[in-house]
């Protein structure tokens, strides 16, 4: 019934049945308790013999010096442990700070399920909303943490989740309080298990002791609450599960309390996997309450690799599941496909490449083909990671998350690469190639664009090579950092997602990589774009080269993925929403039947390099790199059949692109600036002054003003009848809210949502603290690039 009991120290159990593997991540807003919860999971699973503490800087997953000194998660960490004896949980703890969004995006790419942690006092916060949207398609369970805090609101938070995320829920457990006779206050002591109809109370003096009480020991008020919750659970699940309806009417004789916990768990699992509902649990991880039921829920409700969504591929290849072998690409049980989602450099072990194996087995000593960059190498020393510690294994099987190490992988794999190997034969790539599967690629990770930059210069000319090597390591580990060079001044520019992001990069560059560099002041990453399509420019010579090039502006949402239609192929160029468009010719000898000496992929990659270098030269307003532009290569292009080098292609296309851009008048360019989504939480007595300051001094556009825990039934995701669904959902009374004096109108908080130029919001948190006596909070997320209006142009250019 319950997966927890006597805690025993356990090692890693290899080769677990696929159906008993859970690849999960923990996602939440910063300070919701992700790392604290992870530490308890490791302790109660027997993985560790002590509980680490964030404030003391001794947690397992936050092991970087910067993480321990700042008390925040900066990079995702992977660790494996067992639960319920035979289930293995591969857990990735992700950052909550907005500057490290890419770490979350990388992790979501390879996860099968998520645990969303909410702060019971703060409710559904900005970063939680963002990551919830990013994790669309991934089944989730929700854990409401910090139920011991004054002002915690379990039901308020559940209702907020339902409305903001347009999500149905079932209450798997609810908070259990007791009255403290000394203080006469309600104290959180455990949970009411709705599935098993039990009360679980944790001993405050012994972290390993849990008292489990049967239903006959409940007082009438608790029994009434639990009965209502059980009724609501059965009613909700019955909407999605006919088997439950049949069991309820026949076996349970229409009695909600007689419905079997086994049947309920099965029904919750089914509806969670289909994402019709999200199970809700609660606890206080810091007080060691509620973590074991959360682990039970991970095993009981979240998908195994056999039940997870299929990875998205670059081409139409059939994917299926075999109950014994796992995922099959093109019905080929011999092909092993893995995805590299993270690369880090360890000063002792060298380069570590984190991979998720989707099909087959990745074996030590086997040849591997990187279908993203065309490189081939042999696997040496695969390992399982336990935060910053490794465990050697001989292979990584389908569904597993592991790490490739050793000199054979160095420089051959980057984040987002697809790896292909033969599961049975060491050098079996030829047989995979014969079946046409060697070019299979899992769609890459979308890298968000940088919004801040700093100039980096070597302290002496002799330090330049060391600086470039250090920057290469930095960008390999974190592709959301971007290094570029000003062709006119030869200055090196490092760009990132935010002030903290670049501050951490600076620390690593100076302290970890020992780079002898000088670092300039923080600057905003402006871009330029063109407003009209250029005239075609043509090159043709007697040798056999012919290119017709046109450059056009792009409008609409930033997507940055390969697109292939019947008439043209689109290739993304870096992170600035630029594309290379190849028109498909009707002439034989091109495209799929290319028979030239120089490979077709080399031609494409060479022209991509031309585009990137040319766009980096910048526009005519401020010399900023180009954004949202497309280079179109007309379908009549020609390359000599006997050409073996790409140098001529590089020179020709680059000159054509530059010529095309130079032909445009300055008036055909526009300056782009980053716009931020801004969310400010402020006491309502300061609201007027804050709004006046935002609109008057920070060029903000106010989108909405809401109560902090207000419920907007009119959000774009809600359906017409969703208000009725939310209102009919049974939720227990929030008996602790009165302690927070939330009924005092003067203490109520408002949430101001706005859009504002990043330039106007730099260091705004200091201004907000001054306006609100230190009580205001601001959250910002990148919204997109927007053209600077003519009246603001001079102000922006002058800094």
Swiss-Prot record:
It is found in: Mitochondrion. Residues 19-306 form the tr-type G domain. GO terms for molecular function: GTP binding; GTPase activity. Mitochondrial GTPase that mediates the disassembly of ribosomes from messenger RNA at the termination of mitochondrial protein biosynthesis. Not involved in the GTP-dependent ribosomal translocation step during translation elongation. Keywords: GTP-binding, Mitochondrion, Nucleotide-binding, Protein biosynthesis. GO terms for biological process: mitochondrial translation; ribosome disassembly. The gene is MEF2. It comes from Vanderwaltozyma polyspora (strain ATCC 22028 / DSM 70294 / BCRC 21397 / CBS 2163 / NBRC 10782 / NRRL Y-8283 / UCD 57-17) (Kluyveromyces polysporus). This is Ribosome-releasing factor 2, mitochondrial.
């Amino acid at each position: 019934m319950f997966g927890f009991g006597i805690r025993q120290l356990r090692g890693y159990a290899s080769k677990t049945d696929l159906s008993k593997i859970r690849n999960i991540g923990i996602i939440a807003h910063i300070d919701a308790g992700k790392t604290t919860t992870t530490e308890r999971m490791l302790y109660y699973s027997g993985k560790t013999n002590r509980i680490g503490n964030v404030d003391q800087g001794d947690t397992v997953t936050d092991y970087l010096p910067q993480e321990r000194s700042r008390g925040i998660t900066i990079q995702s960490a992977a660790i494996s442990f067992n639960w319920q004896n035979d289930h293995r949980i591969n857990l990735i703890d992700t950052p909550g700070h907005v500057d490290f969004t890419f770490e979350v995006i990388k992790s979501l790419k390879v996860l099968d399920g998520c645990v969303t942690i909410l702060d019971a006092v703060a409710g559904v916060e900005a970063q939680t909303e963002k990551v919830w949207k990013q994790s669309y398609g991934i089944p989730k369970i929700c854990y409401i943490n910090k139920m011991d805090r004054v002002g915690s609101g379990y039901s308020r938070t559940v209702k907020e989740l339902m409305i903001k995320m347009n999500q149905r829920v079932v209450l798997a457990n609810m908070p259990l309080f007791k009255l403290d006779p000394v203080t006469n206050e309600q104290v959180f002591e455990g949970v009411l298990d709705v599935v098993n109809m039990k009360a679980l109370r944790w001993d405050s003096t012994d972290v390993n002791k849990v008292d489990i009480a049967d239903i006959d020991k409940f007082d009438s008020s608790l029994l009434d609450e639990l009965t209502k919750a059980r009724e609501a659970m059965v009613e909700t699940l019955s909407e999605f599960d006919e088997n439950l309806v049949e069991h309820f009417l026949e076996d349970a004789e229409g009695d909600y309390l007689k419905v079997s916990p086994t049947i309920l768990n099965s029904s919750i699992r089914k509806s969670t996997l289909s994402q019709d509902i999200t199970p809700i649990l609660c606890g206080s991880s810091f007080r060691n309450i509620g973590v074991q039921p959360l682990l039970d829920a991970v095993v009981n409700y979240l998908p195994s690799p056999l039940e997870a969504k299929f990875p998205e591929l670059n081409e139409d290849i059939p994917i299926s599941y075999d109950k014994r072998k796992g995922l099959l690409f093109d019905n080929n049980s011999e092909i092993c496909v893995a995805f590299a989602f993270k690369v880090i450099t360890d000063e002792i072990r060298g380069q570590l490449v984190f991979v998720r194996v989707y099909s087959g087995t990745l074996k030590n000593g086997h040849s591997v083909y990187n279908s993203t960059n065309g490189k081939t190498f042999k696997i040496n020393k695969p390992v399982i990671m336990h935060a910053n510690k490794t465990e050697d294994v001989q292979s990584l099987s389908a569904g597993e998350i592991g790490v490739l190490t050793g000199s054979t992988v160095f420089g051959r794999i980057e984040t987002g690469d697809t790896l292909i190997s033969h599961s049975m034969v060491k050098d079996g790539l030829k047989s995979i190639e014969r079946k046409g599967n060697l070019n299979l690629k899992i769609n890459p990770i979308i890298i968000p664009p940088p919004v801040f930059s700093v100039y980096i210069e070597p302290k002496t000319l002799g330090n330049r090579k060391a600086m470039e090597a250090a920057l290469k390591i930095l960008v390999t580990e974190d592709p959301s950092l971007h290094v570029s060079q000003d062709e006119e001044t030869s200055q090196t520019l490092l760009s990132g997602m935010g002030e903290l992001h670049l501050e951490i990069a600076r620390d690593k560059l100076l302290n970890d990589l020992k780079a002898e560099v000088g670092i300039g002041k923080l600057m905003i990453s402006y871009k330029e774009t063109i407003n009209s399509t250029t005239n075609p420019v043509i090159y043709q010579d007697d040798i056999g080269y012919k290119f017709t090039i046109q450059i056009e502006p792009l409008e609409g949402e930033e997507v940055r993925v390969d697109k292939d239609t019947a008439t043209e192929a689109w290739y993304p160029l870096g992170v600035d929403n630029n594309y290379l468009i190849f028109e498909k010719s009707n002439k034989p000898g091109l495209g799929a039947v290319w028979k030239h000496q120089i490979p077709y992929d080399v031609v494409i990659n060479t022209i991509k390099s031309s585009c990137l270098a040319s766009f980096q030269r910048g526009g005519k307003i401020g010399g900023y790199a180009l954004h949202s532009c497309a280079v179109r290569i007309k379908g009549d292009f020609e390359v000599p059949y006997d050409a073996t080098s790409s140098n001529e292609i590089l020179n020709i296309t680059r000159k054509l692109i530059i010529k095309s851009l130079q032909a445009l008048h300055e008036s055909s360019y526009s300056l782009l600036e980053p716009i931020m989504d801004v969310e400010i939480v402020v006491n309502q007595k300061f609201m007027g002054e804050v709004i006046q300051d935002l609109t008057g001094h920070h060029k903000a556009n106010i989108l909405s003003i809401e109560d902090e825990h207000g419920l907007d039934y009119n959000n774009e995701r809600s359906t017409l009848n969703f208000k009725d669904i939310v209102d009919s959902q049974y939720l227990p009374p929030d008996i602790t809210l009165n302690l927070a004096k939330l009924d005092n109108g003067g203490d109520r908080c408002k949430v101001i949502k706005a859009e504002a130029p990043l330039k106007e919001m730099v260091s705004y948190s200091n201004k907000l603290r001054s306006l609100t006596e230190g009580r205001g909070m601001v959250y910002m997320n990148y919204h997109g690039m927007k053209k600077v209006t003519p009246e603001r142009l001079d102000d922006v250019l002058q800094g």
